[in-house]
């Protein structure tokens, strides 16, 4: 019997276009391999689409707010249909950069030092606040956003300008900038799928570097690490995946500097576009795109 897959994509976040691309790529591969597919927005028609299509599994291809922060997962739980990726609690924790960093620190996982800045509450001179707790340069980013949306590397000369850009966000995370190598690790079924190193031409692996082929970010795989260091970084990624309570596939983002691995964040809904890293890591391991998708579907469940 042909399986019916409803793909959730689009949404209202700043990562809408990436989500649409992920949904399109997954749908194309599933249709090519004989699956019945319906792509749906997470809007007022979702319940009607679920009722009429009667999917066997819901593939969550949403990114960003409402898609990977626990909200849509809570709605999907009420539908009693197996869905992919992490559940309500893990999604909400991973999306909140401050909460996830607190959990990393509690579990002795190295992560850059940080402070939280609230536009309404913090009346102190921000430069003095940073100099007291951190050191320049710093990375400034929204606490609840993905795909490096509105992430800036700042020094004293541009910190105020970039904070002004972020004024629409109540809370901002300001963390020490860690130089060094950018390495990403994919975890699947609580096991390491592999690692990939990025050499962006830009200052760091930002939104443009991730999704614009003209940015010409170099993808290096296999990663040039000693056996011991590779085991170390994949072990940290596995630990973070487990501690947060993630399911399915995740991608952990690291900086490697002075022999230390710094975990920046864990992504519960890694992209599945042509430029996405998890499919590339899987391919290097001999896992085709359709096999990766089918594994994600097979792992789907309720009460995640």
Curated annotation (Swiss-Prot):
Substrates-to-products reaction catalysed: 2 D-alanine + ATP = D-alanyl-D-alanine + ADP + phosphate + H(+)
GO cellular component terms attached to this protein's record: cytoplasm
Superkingdom of the organism of origin: Bacteria
Domain ATP-grasp: start-end pairs: 101-298
Positions bound to ATP: 131-184
Stored Gene3D superfamilies: 3.40.50.20, ATP-grasp fold, A domain, ATP-grasp fold, B domain
Keyword line: ATP-binding, Cell shape, Cell wall biogenesis/degradation, Cytoplasm, Ligase, Magnesium, Manganese, Metal-binding, Nucleotide-binding, Peptidoglycan synthesis
Cofactor: Mg(2+); Mn(2+)
Cofactor binding annotation: Binds 2 magnesium or manganese ions per subunit.
InterPro entries linked: ATP-grasp, ATP_grasp_subdomain_1, D-Ala_lig_Van_CS, D_ala_D_ala, Dala_Dala_lig_C, Dala_Dala_lig_N, PreATP-grasp_dom_sf
Binding positions for Mg(2+) 2 per the UniProt entry: 265, 267
SUPFAM superfamilies, per the entry: Glutathione synthetase ATP-binding domain-like (SSF56059), PreATP-grasp domain (SSF52440)
GO process annotations (BP): cell wall organization; peptidoglycan biosynthetic process; regulation of cell shape
Enzyme nomenclature, EC number: 6.3.2.4
The keyword Translocase is assigned to this record: no
Role, per record: Cell wall formation.
Family listed: Belongs to the D-alanine--D-alanine ligase family.
Name assigned to this protein: D-alanine--D-alanine ligase
Gene assigned in the entry: ddl
